[in-house]
Each structure stands twice: as C-alpha cells, then as structure tokens.
Amino acid sequence: MPTYPVVPTFITVHLGLPDSSAPNVTVPFTSYIKNVASHELYPTWPEAALRANIMAQISFALNRVYTEFYRSRGYDFDITSTTQRDQAYVSGGNVFENISQIVDDIFNNYIVRQGNIEPLFAAFCDGVRTRCNGLSQWGSVDLAEAGDIPYEILQYYYGDDINIVFDAPVADNIPSYPGRPLERGSYGQSVRTIQQQLNRIHENYPGIPVISPVSNAYDRNTEDAVREFQRVFNLDTDGIVGKATWYKIKEVWTGVKQLSELASEGLTLTEVQPTFPEVLRYGDEGVTVSTVQYYLAFLGYFLPEQPPVALTGVFDDDTRDAVYTCLLYTSPSP
C-alpha cells in the first residue's frame, strides 16, 4: 500500500464475486462512487443522510484500495460489484443528479479513527432486510429527519472517536510492491516496511523470529524471518521477498491488524512514517519523493500560491517549483 492514503484516479471493479469469470471495468473513482450511491440509496432521502452514506461508501472503497485487499490475494481488481462482498455497482447504471453533485463535493473526504491513518472499513447495511454493526441506511434517514448532521450520523454508528479527512490528495493507484525482489543486501524503505510487518505478524505467529533492529537493510535476521514466514504459509523458502511473498506478507499483516474490519487495530502515522535521506535532489525517485509530494499537495489546500504537484515519485520540474514556492512563503523573513 502507499505510505499515506490517497484517492485513486481510477478504480478497477470486478463485476461479480471474486472467483467468477465476470469481466473487470476500470472507471474514474468519482464515477464509481456515483454509481454505487445511486444503486444503494434513494435520491429523495434527506441530504444529511445521503452525505453520511456516501462518506461511508467512499471510506469503504478506499479501505479496499489502501489495504490492497484483493490484489494482495492475487486478484487483478480493487473491489467487486456485489453486496455479498462489497457494495452495489451496476455497469452502465444511471446516476441521480443530486447524488452526483454530492459526490463531486465530497469524493476525497473519508472517515478515520482518531489516531489512525487508514480509511475506516465503514461497514453498512440497509437496516431492514439485513443488520450489521455498521451504519444502517434507513436508520440514517431517521437520524437526518430528526436533525442530525452527517458527522453526527456517522458518529452514531461508528463511534465518537472518528474524524473526517478532508480534501485528500488524488493520485494514480500505484501497487505497493517495489517492482523488484528484496534480498540480502537490499536497502531502502521497502525493506523497513517488510521488517515492521513481519514483526507485527510475529505477535500472532511467534515462530517467525523478531527482526531487531528494524532498519532499511535486508540482513541475515530479515532473511531468516522471511524464510520462516514462507515456510509457515507454504511459499518457496528462498528467503527472498518477490511479488508473491510481498503480497502474502501484506495479506497476513492486514489480517492480524484487522485493517479491513470495522474493529480495526488501526494503523498509526508512526508505523508508516518513512525514514528520510538528508537531501533530495532534482531527478531523485522513490517513496521519499512521493511523501514530499504528498505534503506539498496537502499544503496546497491552505496556501493558494502553491502550484499543484502530482504524486509521481519523481523529483521533476513541478516538484521543484512547488518546493521553491513552499520555501518562499513559509521561510521566516530575514
């Protein structure tokens, strides 16, 4: 997963159950949410209820994308179209105008637990035919008619300890796998990520040795932990983190932390905070550059002079211009 959540430009939907032979469609994220909301909700509902429900649908979808729930299991899509697993999506389905306008307004806002960064797995059901521990769609209508605002409706169902992230950056959905195997001698943030995840998995599978210290270096301790993980989960025990091992670690780690459940253990900022080199230069690439771009894009919501910057992971001309502008407007006057 990316270090910090972003709203994907596009999302890939499987039009059926995960193992069915149904086709995939890749659509803009906003179009996906508009379609889901138009098939899950009634446009005549109070606006507060619509906004609360749409916020839950956004958070649900972003959780699937951020945790790579399906991709870590070997599927080539982000979410399914069926309410048996996810939320209703009808390819080519109609969209209601008022729902479309609400989505345009809030598509990059989502729910988190206080202190956590991952989009909340905002489970919901209709509250009449089916019941669940999350939001009741028809119940939200009653709350809205009683005068509750969207945030109060969400608090009623998900607890008082939720926050809303507003205006999250929009970027392409980039797979978390670094694109090359990690092995003895590898170095970087991807190595550190694997070390941290294996150490958390150790709490549930104590046979996997603890990696200490956690660093950016793929050392003997890391290799030993990877081999034991591979043995436990029936992978080739080569001690190398290729794509299959990377995503199996991701799947198990997401499972033990319950990140794709309403009662999530949560993911804090310190858990994903990358270690930074002292200097980044024009032409540099990698997750550190993406992180700087994320903060520059975030700053743009508060500093109108800040030029837009895409999360490309490449220190390019746009990134350089954004850095110059940031320094110009934030550096103390001499």
Where are these regions (language model features)?
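Surface-exposed loop/turn segments and immediately adjacent short secondary-structure elements
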Residues: 307
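Histidine- and aromatic-enriched segments that form or immediately flank copper-ligand environments
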Residues: 312
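Conserved small/polar residues in nucleotide/adenosyl-binding loops
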Residues: 329-334
